Amino acid sequence: MRSIRVVILGDELLTGAGDPKGLGWLGRVQARLPKGEDVAFFPLAMVDENTGELLERWKSEALKRFSPDSENYLVVALSSKDIEAGTTISRSRLNLASLLDDAQREGVKTFVVGPTPKGNPEYDAEVEHLNAGFYDVVKRRQIRYVDCYNPLKEHEGWLSEVTSHPRTLPGQVGYGLIAWLVLNRGWFEWLGLVEEDQS
């Protein structure tokens, strides 16, 4: 049997904060894994982390959770904190590129989830530029990228939840939407698994 280890780097959204069910998008994705497969998830969340900080910590935290006897996968769930940090788009792109190139050198397969909108038009205009920059970096490396920004920027269910939460976190609907996007952007193919029929 294959042994699969998946490390997930990201922000508060990895913890499911704001979700009454406590599952978040990651728990919902994990629940859809085929039964009988040896897949271990290692979520490593850090609140308010920008890409520079993510680049600094990823190796020390992720590599110790991988094994030479397992297939090792890395999910990078990006936030929009570079905006608050005043990081330029060029620097954001470079940080992500360095992380992905490092992971490739380590023999780790990567999957990238983009930042989400916050329901604030002025802020979201910056998220849109950041998302486009991230997408370009990932596309050049032929890595899967989940664009969360464009599908959610005008979604009523998403906007209703994030604009009513004091920390602009989604709830049950929003996390379900992120999970759906992840599952339908090549998730199972990336892991080399067959999706089970849910009907």
PLM features: residue spans?
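Serine-esterase "nucleophile elbow" of acetyl-processing enzymes
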Residues: M1-V47, K59-S70
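Structural motif
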Residues: R5, N72-V75, K109
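Cell-envelope and extracellular/periplasmic
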Residues: L13, L44-E49, V76-E84, K139
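A general structural detector for well-ordered alpha-helical segments in enzyme core domains, enriched
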Residues: W25, V29, E61, S92-L99, ...
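Active-site segments of SGNH/GDSL-like serine hydrolases
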Residues: A77-K81, L99-A132, H155
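Catalytic His-Asp segment of secreted/periplasmic serine-dependent ester chemistry enzymes
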Residues: P117-S199
